[in-house]
């Protein structure tokens, strides 16, 4: 089979009734498709929204709450109810499910990242279906992933999935908003995610949930840069998950990079927090960005920040001011300053295995639109 390990992301609009409450029939349909794929030999992960939708009614709210505390309380109640729906339906087919609640810190902190990866690997190898959501009940803004589109891409990259599928109420990426523009056409295959694609996504988003088309495209960048292809398709068809796995569903397919980022490079590119800045000369800039070389001390022009040995810093081309990438340093700021002052600096500040160049595609992730 072409796609053995698949991550499915199901959004709020694919799980709810018109009044915003959880649709048990929609949950049942999703679990039936998961069961069929599981029985066919696929390894599956489900990133599911819907905790607030499942819980707000049980707390006596007439409609989906808008206050943060009310939403967190609803999620606390609803996460258990939502998992119960999934678990009950899957157990009817003798399939074990597992709940994993994550925050951004589980990706930023290397130890927690490794632990999450190991837990997911064991679950998949033992035939369980992990059901993942952000830990909405306790997470604060500083630790939020922000949306399940991004979370699903981070998970797909972490487990080196063969495919990431976004199930939504829009059957792919269009050149315009298909609800208002009769000339809008769906893009069936996207080779590169660039500014033009980002602009298209801004006009073709879903209005439900927290993740519209723009967040899906930015999430697709994380996945495709990590070697995971992405499929955006409609959740409205009864067999959409099965057809997506078989490549027979209508939608938009995003091609993965042939040489996807390894786990260490993923962490550097998407999660590592920079503790300082380094400016380099033209020769060092070319060595890093064009030739895949390590950063030698002799190419450093200037350093800024109170970083220590092993910290991550951002490197800039002094001449152009352009950000070149991020890497792990072999010397702290004080030691580096002493060596640069002596004008006899020799050795390596950042080895190439501890370096990630910031490509135009990755740069788009950190651009506000």
Swiss-Prot record:
Binding site for ATP: 9, 168-169, 210-216
Disulfide bonds: none
InterPro entries documented for this protein: AceGlu_kinase-like_sf, Asp/Glu/Uridylate_kinase, G5K_ProB, Glu/AcGlu_kinase, Glu_5kinase, Glu_5kinase/COase_Synthase, Glutamate_5-kinase_CS, PUA
Gene Ontology terms, MF aspect: ATP binding; glutamate 5-kinase activity; RNA binding
Keywords from the UniProt entry: Amino-acid biosynthesis, ATP-binding, Cytoplasm, Kinase, Nucleotide-binding, Proline biosynthesis, Transferase
Protein's UniProt keywords contain Transmembrane helix: no
Chain residues that bind substrate: 49, 136, 148
Catalyses which reaction(s): L-glutamate + ATP = L-glutamyl 5-phosphate + ADP
Location (main, coarse): cytoplasm
GO cellular component, one term: cytosol
Residue ranges annotated for the PUA domain, each copy included: 275-355
EC number: 2.7.2.11
Annotated pathway: Amino-acid biosynthesis; L-proline biosynthesis; L-glutamate 5-semialdehyde from L-glutamate: step 1/2
Cellular compartment(s): Cytoplasm
UniProt keyword annotation of Metal-binding present: no
UniProt xrefs under Pfam families: AA_kinase (PF00696), PUA (PF01472)
GO biological process: L-proline biosynthetic process
Family designation: Belongs to the glutamate 5-kinase family.
Function: Catalyzes the transfer of a phosphate group to glutamate to form L-glutamate 5-phosphate.
Protein name as catalogued: Glutamate 5-kinase
Source organism of the structure: Streptococcus pneumoniae (strain 70585)
Taxonomic placement: Bacteria, Bacillati, Bacillota, Bacilli, Lactobacillales
Gene: proB
